[in-house]
Amino acid sequence: MTRKRPALAEPVSSSRSRVTRRSTTGAPSSKKKRSPEPESDADSEDDYDGPSTSQTKKLKRGNSSTNRGKAANKTKRGSFQVKQEIMDDDENEEKIDGEVENGITSREHSPDPSTFKKTAKLQTKKKKKKESPPETPPTSPSPSPSRSVSPSTTKSDISSKKGRKAVVNSVSKVKIEKESTPVKTNGRNLPPKRKKKPVEEETAEEIKLRERAERKARRIEEAKNRPKLTIEQKLAKLRKKKERRERRKEQEKEESMRQKYGQRKIKAEASKWNFGPISSINQRRRDEMMAYFPKANFLAEDGVPKVMNNFRRATVKYNMEVLNPFITCGICDGYIVDATTIIDCMHTFCKSCLLTYFESDNNTCPTCGTFIHGSHPTHYVTYDRAVNELVNQFVPKMENNELDVRKTFLRDCREALGIDTAAEDRERKERLERERITGTNRCYPLERPRFSHHRDDCQVTVNLLPGTANLPLITRPYVRCSEMTTMNTLKKFLSLQIWDDQSRYSDLDMFCDGQLMGKDFSVRFVWMMKRRGQPKSEPLIIRYHMTRT
């Protein structure tokens, strides 16, 4: 017999699959079933995914075994047809997968009732997919009585039922792959977009630290690129830096003094008490005076300070009109006598004027109206030695005239009481002469306080030593004196001990720790400057030199 050539594979769009046609011809008539036609129009065949490759293999092999029979020629032909059909089904599956990915859903409708049934069931599955994926196929719609059921549709119905699960699984796999695969842009696989985390705002302290670190890094980078300086350039740079620092300090000091004293409101109101030492009060007074001085008057026409013109003679010429507001009393409008300063507001008056003002039930400052104390205002005032010495230096012979006036007043008072003042004067002169000859230094209880040599003050021990070899060591180098003793007094004592002439005291200079002491420096001031915090039982060493000419 001549071998028949197998038929070619039908295209995907045919109304019946090859499996269906082969099953209808080979299957017995008892197993054939009618397949009802769908009532509603179905979608195109492209929405339907055929059964998987493994299922089609098993199905086709089973069908081919029934059709083959026992003949050898039929076996060879069936195996070739199975291979051809498997290849066709693989191509169909690839096409269907591509159509599912690209979202192709609309094509021409096919009149095949089996495809109608498949597409209708897929529509119901798509609607119920969010709720629960169906494991079993839904019930088919009722058949229409107008059409006759062909026996070929029964086997296709069975094959469609077997491949329905595979269709659902393939569709779900495609969608899962779509969700899992990264987004494709310009042929590149990009990772999924991440949600932007909220940026935390920096606090003020963090911004400050970051800016400081940036400035430091910038300075380090600039220092690396900067050329190395020579020694002269470094010294000049340090000198300029020091001048800028001093200039800045002076400006800050002037500004603080101007704000403190230049804008004071005259009101009678209580303020904070300031019980500082006398030295701090004097420093504040000096700062206040320097802040109020018009600095333009210190310069001459050539730009050189007037002080430098008279520096060799150690004198300074200045108009008294500028200094008068600082050395006159605000109560009597005269020069201050026995300067007394209010601690809180730093205004100075005469002692007698201020006490008289307090006796008339006044407890505020006469100048600014600052409240001092309700019941004891005299406890919050102090003797201002610095202002008193300034007044005596600016107004010469004023102190001597004041002493003469006091002597005359006391003599008149004693004469009014019937006391012989002439005999007392003769007796006092004789006593002073005897003390000068014998060298005694006793104080009498009936003497006035200013003749008691400040024995009631705090006492300090001073050790006087020669600073050069041409000066001798005095016989009594240890001196116990008041802390208010000045350097001029010590120089007079040394001139009497060395040359027996008090007028030569200007030939000596006093040094402490290698530093020249001013003639008006008190022992207390030198102690606070050089020996602050040390016990006063230890002597203060002061060396005397000849004046350099």
UniProtKB/Swiss-Prot annotation:
InterPro entries, alphabetized: PcG_RING_finger, Znf_C3HC4_RING-type, Znf_RING, Znf_RING/FYVE/PHD, Znf_RING_CS
Pro residues composition bias: residue spans: 134-144
SUPFAM superfamilies attached to this UniProt entry: RING/U-box
Chief location: nucleus
Paired cysteines (S-S): none
Region entry Disordered, spans: 1-263
Protein name: Polycomb group RING finger protein 3 homolog mig-32
Organism: Caenorhabditis elegans
Gene name, Swiss-Prot/TrEMBL: mig-32
